[in-house]
Amino acid sequence: MAALRAGKTNNEADQPSSPVLRFGADKPLKLDAGTLLSPFQIAYQTYGTLNDARSNAILVCHALTGDQHVANTNPVTGKPGWWEVLIGPGRIIDTNRFFVICSNVIGGCLGSTGPASTNPATGKPYGLDLPVITIRDMVRAQQMLIDHFGIEKLFCVLGGSMGGMQVLEWASSYPERVFSALPIATGARHSSQNIAFHEVGRQAVMADPDWHGGKYFENGKRPEKGLAVARMAAHITYLSEAALHRKFGRNLQDREALTFGFDADFQIESYLRHQGMTFVDRFDANSYLYMTRSMDYFDLAADHGGRLADAFAGTKTRFCLVSFTSDWLFPTEESRSIVHALNAAGASVSFVEIETDRGHDAFLLDEPELFAAINGFIGSAARARGLSA
């Protein structure tokens, strides 16, 4: 936690606690912004063992505020990996059977090149000098990481939310390298409503007087208040009205009566403030700007002449899409439109809509129906791939 609070830079940005793959000037990353990023690095974690045929590799793609620590203790927060409930020895994604890879996306803040990383041209953090990063840029970098392992074809690519966008981009850009794909709680484009919520968050960050045009590391104080407010606003979209009512209702926080002031009278107010305060301990404000922008720019149909089915033309990848009934960030109709496009493209696709009131974040929680869907799809794909149980 102190690694992000203290000093002028984030140590994890340049020298992460996880393995890191560095690319020099001879291997630049081509960006959609029309520039080349060089040098750059990718921080990652792996679990399990790659088999001799290199056919058992699963790539896990993280969401907006996630990282590579999917199934191990996070070195910054000290908390368990964000999907340890799903991934590990003997779990649904069994690391005794599969080789699991998860990388921090380009633009992130836990070891892959991002705005908190040192710009070799200046010796200072990039800040806003880093070109805007897209979902496709993230996937291009991941593809270079997969090449490093000598893996020609991934057995499965899976992820939720922004991770699901990466899954779709993988299946579209590199269909020959993806045997199966599992996009969860996601969409093929970001809606105007979602862009609006992101813009509120970005403006909260940029309105913080400590932001200094993104050069806050040089001033020794980060825009924590703005980032906390951005997180509070975003966190509401990850939940559902039913879940909020069940957990908080209009219950008061550590008091028996209203204070007639502006302290956190209600439990929900206290909860959101806590979410904001803990978030700034583990995430970089500029990375938040970059990550939200990458999601806003994502529009798979627009990248293929306006017809989503053309993004998957001729694909032989097996797909399973999962949505949640109470997810109003990426509602079920978003997944259905992807399923319709895959059907039009002649792809092998299944679709699971899970009844739950836990909202968008259900994909990160202990959700038995989700686990059953993943288990069934992975098992079927493994048999088709010829992977032994």
From Swiss-Prot:
Pathway participation: Amino-acid biosynthesis; L-methionine biosynthesis via de novo pathway; O-acetyl-L-homoserine from L-homoserine: step 1/1
Listed SUPFAM superfamilies: alpha/beta-Hydrolases
Subunit structure: Homodimer.
Any Gene Ontology CC annotation: cytoplasm
UniProt-listed Enzyme Commission number(s): 2.3.1.31
The gene coding this protein: metXA
Entry binding sites for substrate: R231, D361
Assigned protein family: Belongs to the AB hydrolase superfamily. MetX family.
Keywords: Acyltransferase, Amino-acid biosynthesis, Cytoplasm, Methionine biosynthesis, Transferase
Cellular compartments annotated: Cytoplasm
UniProt domain AB hydrolase-1: residue ranges: 56-366
One annotated GO molecular function: homoserine O-acetyltransferase activity
Species this protein is from: Mesorhizobium japonicum (strain LMG 29417 / CECT 9101 / MAFF 303099) (Mesorhizobium loti (strain MAFF 303099))
Region (Disordered): 1-21
UniProt-recorded name of the protein: Homoserine O-acetyltransferase
